[in-house]
Each structure stands twice: as structure tokens, then as C-alpha cells.
């Protein structure tokens, strides 16, 4: 009898050893499969959000190009200029034009720096109501005043004369709905629509009221400032991002377009490193850990908690001892507990999906559109298409760098510098070359 009992115990130990070994093999195989799924999800997530960002940028630029080619009001200057472009004297000297344009660009840059620093100071000392009031006034002017001017010029260009009451009613509803969607609550698509139209209107204002050469200098110096403000250790926009992450809060509305949701953060393409405010409960902490808030680019795709999944099919044979039965029961409980978080994790993943996305500042929308709109004002489609392609290539390259470095990066420099190079090369080299070749009947 003792020998029989020892044989049974030895057989039970061997069986348990084989079970644990088989479980480890299954677990390793499942972990490898999970890693492959995560990598595939990262690629799909990144590609989808790049497309979701290209579409609104293209729509904003298309609206500006369409307006520049159909409404003469925005393509003609009429001698009016912005207050912060004081050097507008007429001259034929290229050197004087260049110096005056550079002076105007530097004055405008000083205004941008001053407003940025003022915004940082308000945010640092938590003057949130003052900041929101400032942004609400800006949105109000864009949605009511500038939209009214735009609609008026559109009606003039297409020779349409509706009732004044009808126009006022429509513009009033449009403005009120926009204020609600941007600063309060509203459907996602409607929020995105209003942010795109606001960016296009602001770009049209810059194109109309900035002097001819000043536009190009402004684009250059603003791109350089974007580099300094984001990448330097004491840069204001970098400080803004870090402060917001420390406080674990969004900054302000009406500043950011997100490919996932309108979730205001910064004036640059940024990576969010904030942790999720929901803490795991004690029951969940045994099987999974709460994962941090996701980045706003494809390089930080959310990773589901790795849970060891063991098949629930556990056979308890009649000749096993009571201890073996007890161990099997414990194993079943652990398996069921490991399976439970998947439902909660799925809901949490859906919640995170609503708040993630590649975030691009409205300033980037505006200056992309300024570049393309100014290029289209000369009615040269070769130059316009070249600038459009350059902007998208630069934006795509910026997103690649964002995924590699996983930190806030400026979205203007690469796209704007590429657009400027493509513009001048196409306008001064390629277009004259193609024209001459066509005139010589060498190209059909």
C-alpha cells in the first residue's frame, strides 16, 4: 500500500509538472501572438490617423484655394494692410522690398512671441477664465464678423441676392452653433468642420492683408520660431506641454484639431504622456495593470494588459487526491478571473479610442493654407500642386519623426520649408522651362 501511494503521488506530481510545462508553452505562444497583434494594430492605428489628419488639412487648403480662384476680394489687396506690418512703402528696389518684408515679418514674429508668452503666464498662474474669455472673443470674431464678410463677398461674386433677414438668421444660427460646438458640447464632425472653416478664414485674412513679399518671410520666420518654441529646453510651447502633462488636464478649446476627437492640447503635433486618471481596483490589480494614457501618434498605440489565458477545460479525474482537486479549483478561479478584465478592457479601450488621435494646432492649418493659397493666387496650377504635395510630404515626415522620438515636435518647419523650396523651384525654374518647351513644340 505505501508503495502504491508513493507511485500515485509520483504520477500526480509528474502530471502536474507536465500541466505546468504545457501551460507555460501556451502562455509563451499567446504572448508572442499578442505582441504580433499589437505591432499590427500600431501600424493600422498610425496609418488611419495619418489619413484622418491629411483629410482635414486638404479640406482647409482646398477651401482657401477655391476662394482665391473664385472670389477676387481675397486676391486683391487694395492698399490695406495689417497693423503689425508697418513697412509698406512702394518701391522698385528688390533690396528695399526684401528689407521691408523682413522687417514686417520680424514685427509680426514679435507680436506672436508676446501673445504666446502672455498665454503661458496666464496658464502658469491658472487664469483659466481669462484665457477662455480671450479665446471666446477670438472665436466670436471669426464666426460672426469674418464669416459675414466672407458670405457677403461670396454672394457678390455669384450674383446672388437673398433676403437680408434670411442671411442674418442663417449667420446667427451658424455662429451660435459654432460657439457651442467649440467651447461647450457638440458632435465631433461638426466641431471639426468649424475648426477647419475658422482656420481657412484666418488664412484668407493673412493672404489678403499681408504685403506681397511679406508672406514668404512670415512663413519662414514663423517656422523658425516653431522650432525654437518647441525643441529648446525653455521653449514656451514645450513648457506649455510639460505643464499640462504635470497637471493632467487639457489646455484650452479652439486651438487644436485632433484626428480622434477635438481634445485641446498644444499648438504643435504633440505626444501625450499623461496617465489615465482611473486607478485600478484591488480586484483587478491581481490580473492586470492600468495602462497609461496613450500618445497622440501611431508610435504609442495602446497596449492591452497582458493576461495569461489558460484554457478553461480542466479535467479532474476520480482517482486524484483531495489536494489535486483543490489546486484545480484554484486554477479554475484564476483562469476565470483572468478572463474577466477583457470585457472591462474592451470598454476602456473604446473610451481611450475616443480621446486619442494625432493632434495638430490650428496655427499649422492656417500657415499651410496661407502657403498654398498664396501660391494659387498666381493661377499657376503646377506651382499649386507642387506646394500641396510638399506640404503633405513634410507633414508625413513629421509624423514619422513623432513616432520615432515620441515627444512633442513642431509641425510647421519641414512642411513649410519644403513648400517654399517647391514653390520657388517650380515658379522660377520648372514653369518657365515647361513653357519654353511647349512653345518650341518639343512637348505635347
Swiss-Prot record:
Annotated active site: 226, 364
GO annotation, biological process: amyloid-beta formation; apical protein localization; calcium ion homeostasis; cell fate specification; cell projection morphogenesis; detection of temperature stimulus; egg-laying behavior; membrane protein ectodomain proteolysis
Keywords: Endoplasmic reticulum, Golgi apparatus, Membrane, Notch signaling pathway, Transmembrane, Transmembrane helix
Membrane as UniProt keyword: yes
Cellular component GO terms held in the UniProt record: endoplasmic reticulum membrane; gamma-secretase complex; Golgi membrane; perinuclear region of cytoplasm
Lumenal side: 67-101, 152-163, 211-212, 381-384
Motif (PAL) on chain: 410-412
Membrane as UniProt keyword: yes
Ranges in the topological domain labelled Cytoplasmic: 1-45, 123-130, 185-189, 234-359, 406-413, 435-444
Record membrane topology: Multi-pass membrane protein
Intramembrane segments: 414-434
Tissue: Expressed in most neurons.
Compositional bias (Polar residues): 282-300, 315-329
Location in or out of the cell: Endoplasmic reticulum membrane; Golgi apparatus membrane
Transmembrane segments: 46-66, 102-122, 131-151, 164-184, 190-210, 213-233, 360-380, 385-405
Primary site of residence: endoplasmic reticulum
InterPro entries, alphabetized: Pept_A22A_Ceel, Peptidase_A22A, Preselin/SPP, Presenilin_C
Disordered: region residues: 275-331
Family per similarity comment: Belongs to the peptidase A22A family.
Comment on protein domains: The PAL motif is required for normal active site conformation.
Quaternary structure note: Homodimer. Component of the gamma-secretase complex, a complex probably composed of the presenilin homodimer (sel-12, hop-1 or spe-4), nicastrin (aph-2), aph-1 and pen-2. Interacts with sel-10.
PANTHER family the record matches: PRESENILIN, PRESENILIN HOMOLOG
Biological function: Probable catalytic subunit of the gamma-secretase complex, an endoprotease complex that catalyzes the intramembrane cleavage of integral membrane proteins such as Notch receptors (lin-12 or glp-1). Provides the major presenilin function compared to hop-1 and spe-4. Required cell-autonomously for correct neurite connectivity of the AIY cholinergic interneurons and their correct functioning in thermotaxis. Required for mesodermal patterning of muscle function. Promotes basement membrane gap formation during tissue remodeling.
Record's protein name: Presenilin sel-12
Organism, as annotated: Caenorhabditis elegans
